[in-house]
Amino acid sequence: ISECDAGIFDAMNKGIKLARGTWINFMNAGDFFSDTSILERMKEYLIKSKADIVYGSCYRYHPFYSYVKVPGNLDLLKKGMEIPHQASFIRGAVQKKHLFSLRYRLAGDHDLFLRLYLQGYSFEYVPVLVCIFSLEGVSNTRLLEAYKETYLVLTKNKVADLKSMNSKLKYVRGYVGCLCEMMLPTNLKWKLKAMKKELADKTKTNRRY
């Protein structure tokens, strides 16, 4: 279908309502499956799975900084977006019951996954590199808006309380961090991100030994 909508999540909701398949996956402009055999490979897992949401890893791409994101502990959803919707497959019956909230322009997918997690729906990780995800999308270029919406998601779902001083301080620190990041030249910003991740990976490796 091609028609006016109230944003990306409104358009995705329209697709959900029309979908007739057992599983639903959304791949946005600029993102794509990691190779042409992914759907066949995922089919093997989806047929056997008893979970409500099945997800894999994704390759996050930027000209200055690229890496494979393997989702961690689901409790991290209480802090931010941990599972890219491009790498996830949600049962159609579940997705139709829980549409994306139109309250958000950027963080609607985070809100959906957090709601499903808090309501006890089952998640299953599978060792498949599902998609290639562009880091030049709106959630990475509109940092302040994305950050504000993340905190709205957390407060709405009652995993953060901006009335507490501790939460307020965390929010302010994060907000200032976004402002500083926006002032950096693009290539420097992504090079610093790459260095930070490399250091974090080395720290994890050292802890194992």
Where are these regions (language model features)?
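Glycine-rich, basic loop-to-helix element that forms the pyrophosphate-binding segment
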Residues: 2-19
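Active-site acidic Asp-centered loop
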Residues: 3, 27-29, 107
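Short aromatic/hydrophobic "clamp" motif used to bind/position activated sugar donors
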Residues: 24
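Conserved nucleotide-sugar donor-binding catalytic segment
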Residues: 56, 66-149, 153
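Conserved donor NDP-sugar-binding/catalytic core segment of glycosyltransferases
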Residues: 32, 36-67
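Membrane-proximal basic amphipathic "stem/tether" segments
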Residues: 158-209
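A short, conserved beta-strand element in the Rossmann-like catalytic core
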Residues: 7, 32-33, 59-61, 105, ...
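Acidic donor-diphosphate engagement hotspot in glycosyltransferases and nucleotidyltransferases
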Residues: 12, 35-41, 50, 108, ...
